[in-house]
Regions:
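Short hydrophobic alpha-helical membrane-embedded segments
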Residues: 18-21, 93-98, 139-146
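Interfacial segments of multi-pass membrane proteins
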Residues: 31-38, 120-138, 144
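Transmembrane helix boundary and interhelical junction motifs in multipass membrane proteins
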Residues: 18-30, 111-122
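Hydrophobic transmembrane alpha-helices of multi-pass small-molecule transporters
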Residues: 53, 145-150
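Residue-level hotspots within the lipid-embedded alpha helices of multi-pass solute transporters
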Residues: 17-18, 49-50, 109-113, 142
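Hydrophobic residues within alpha-helical transmembrane segments
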Residues: 15, 43, 47, 136-144
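Membrane-interfacial helix-loop-helix
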Residues: 1-13, 34-108, 156-189
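Transmembrane alpha-helix boundary and packing residues in multipass membrane permease domains
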Residues: 28-29, 57-61, 121, 125, ...
Length: 189
């Protein structure tokens, strides 16, 4: 990919950031690997990741409901519907109605598999969260995920394998702390 013209590298970042599941979580490390300028690739990845969001919010649920009974696409559409419903239920359980904005922001903003703008938007539409509120929370979440991925990619680029292990250690500690906090909350109830 080193022989690609510079503008095509940025177009690649833009296109990858629009792909479900991969989103900017995949686009930013690619941009870093291609040696692109963070001040250019970051906004390009954000825009690419956000471009499908209004369309997903307004139409995806309807299209998925329509297609779930179709022979060729039914299984995939059903899987997408179940993922959206599951994501919506998780958000509602963890946040309640009042904290749904911040729950949606964090859900999209923490770069874990299956928690990006696509899933967050689908969950927001299943929960019937107001369009403007959803778009605002998802935008902030995408910005947060972009910052986290950019920092992580820079750390790996600078520190190599040590950076990879450092990031893995940080993630494992965060998961462990989360588990401990949940257990303490359940013990109090």
């Amino acid at each position: 990919m080193g022989s690609l013209p510079l503008f095509l590298k940025y177009i690649l970042v833009f296109l990858v950031s629009m792909v479900p599941i991969v989103e900017l979580r995949g686009a930013i490390p690619i941009a870093e690997g291609l040696g692109l300028n963070i001040f250019l690739y970051y906004p390009i990845a954000i825009i690419g990741n956000m471009l499908p969001v209004p369309i997903i919010y307004l139409f995806a649920r309807k299209v998925l409901e329509w297609g779930k009974d179709k022979k060729l696409i039914g299984k995939f559409f059903t899987w997408c519907l179940e993922k959206g419903e599951k994501g919506g239920k998780k958000l509602k359980e963890s946040a309640g109605i009042r904290g749904i904005f911040f729950a949606l922001l964090i859900f999209v903003g923490i770069p874990l598999p299956g928690t990006g703008a696509w899933t967050g938007t689908l969950a927001a539409s299943f929960l019937n969260i107001d369009f403007k509120t959803s778009i605002f929370a998802i935008t902030l979440g995408v910005l947060l995920a972009g910052i986290i991925m950019s920092l992580g990619s820079k750390i790996v680029a600078i520190l190599g394998w040590f950076g990879v292990f450092a990031i893995i250690a940080i993630i494992l500690v965060a998961i462990l702390v989360s588990i401990i906090i949940k257990k303490k909350k359940h013990a109090i109830k």
